[in-house]
Amino acid sequence: MFYYIIAFVMICLDQLTKWLIVKNMMLGDSYPVIDGFFYITSHRNSGAAWGILQGQMWFFYVITLVVIAGIVYYLQKHGQKDKLLGVALALMLGGAIGNFIDRVFRQEVVDFAHFVFGNYHYPIFNIADSSLCVGVILLFIQMLLDGKKTKESTT
């Protein structure tokens, strides 16, 4: 249950921040938080990461539902045994559902976190994207730890 609370909190944070952006900013508006480095920029994305597969909503609906089902399955089957895995899956679940809500109700995803590194503008993202990425990183760490345990037990 704890892991579903983490996912729920991430969904709420994601949807609240997106609602604030849509309500208070025009598309394309940008406000510096740390001038020259971090901006809040109102942006929309009808595709996936970095704007790939623009407008392919049916594809994202199917893939996201399959991913959500897989995450819930693994969370139920393995998440309770391993805290790091549970947190990783919860963050991934929250991120997947957060962006899925946008795709279903807006047919696009609201993005706003905009980082600039010199002349390079990192693709604009949101809380759900961050939740997914942190979850995937934690999942990789868990996999490395599991691999190390397996290697130690066989030697």
From Swiss-Prot:
It is a multi-pass membrane protein. GO terms for biological process: proteolysis. Pfam families: Peptidase_A8. GO terms for molecular function: aspartic-type endopeptidase activity. The chain crosses the membrane at residues 52-72, 85-105, 124-144. Signal peptide: none annotated. Its main location: membrane. The active site is at D111, D129. InterPro entries: Peptidase_A8 (IPR001872). It comes from the Bacteria. It is found in: Cell membrane. Pathway: Protein modification; lipoprotein biosynthesis (signal peptide cleavage). Keywords: Aspartyl protease, Cell membrane, Hydrolase, Membrane, Protease, Transmembrane, Transmembrane helix. GO terms for cellular component: plasma membrane. Coiled coil: none annotated. PANTHER family: LIPOPROTEIN SIGNAL PEPTIDASE (PTHR33695:SF1). This protein specifically catalyzes the removal of signal peptides from prolipoproteins. Belongs to the peptidase A8 family. This is Lipoprotein signal peptidase. The lineage of its organism: Bacteria, Bacillati, Bacillota, Bacilli, Bacillales.
